[in-house]
């Protein structure tokens, strides 16, 4: 069964890079949302294996942490693993304190460490 990932708040270029990585290494289907409301709706209607949230949403500059806390407080999505996509360690630490699993930064997108983190939720690399 194909793994499903929701990618929230990435610009077109970063969404493309993440999508390519997830398809190549995990044969994952990647859906995209641009806002808190879209993410909440998508998570309520699809069984995602992982949600990736940009630290700052590209469409409006809003905080990805707000998306994280909303998803984690919603019974429909509270159990879905969520990662914040950020190069900043303080953002990663804050995300984990708010219920996320350890994420990664875009600078480390192609690293073995990132693939290992993603593999914990998406299975073996393809």
Residue ranges and their predicted role:
Residues 2-13, 18-22, 51:
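Conserved acidic segment of CheY-like receiver
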Residues 52-71:
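Conserved phosphotransfer microenvironments
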Residues 44-46, 72-78, 98:
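Conserved phosphotransfer cores of two-component systems
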Residues 119-126:
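The C-terminal output helix
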Residues 62-63, 87-104:
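Alpha4 helix (beta4-alpha4-beta5 surface) of REC/receiver domains from two-component response regulators
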Residues 34-50:
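Acidic, metal-coordinating helix/loop segments flanking the phosphotransfer/catalytic sites
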Residues 108-118:
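C-terminal output helix
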Residues 78-89:
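A short, hydrophobic beta-strand element within the central beta-sheet of small alpha/beta folds
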């Amino acid at each position: 069964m194909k793994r499903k990932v929701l990618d929230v708040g990435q610009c077109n270029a970063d969404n493309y890079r993440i999508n390519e990585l997830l398809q190549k290494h995990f044969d994952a289907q990647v859906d995209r949302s641009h806002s808190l409301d879209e993410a909440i709706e998508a998570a309520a209607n699809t069984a995602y294996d992982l949600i990736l949230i940009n630290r700052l949403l590209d469409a409006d500059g809003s905080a990805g942490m707000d998306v994280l806390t909303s998803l984690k407080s919603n019974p429909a999505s509270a159990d879905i693993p969520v990662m914040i996509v950020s190069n900043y360690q303080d953002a990663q630490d804050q995300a984990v304190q708010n219920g996320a699993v350890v994420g990664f930064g875009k600078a480390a997108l192609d690293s073995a460490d990132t693939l290992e983190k993603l593999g914990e939720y998406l299975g073996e690399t393809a």
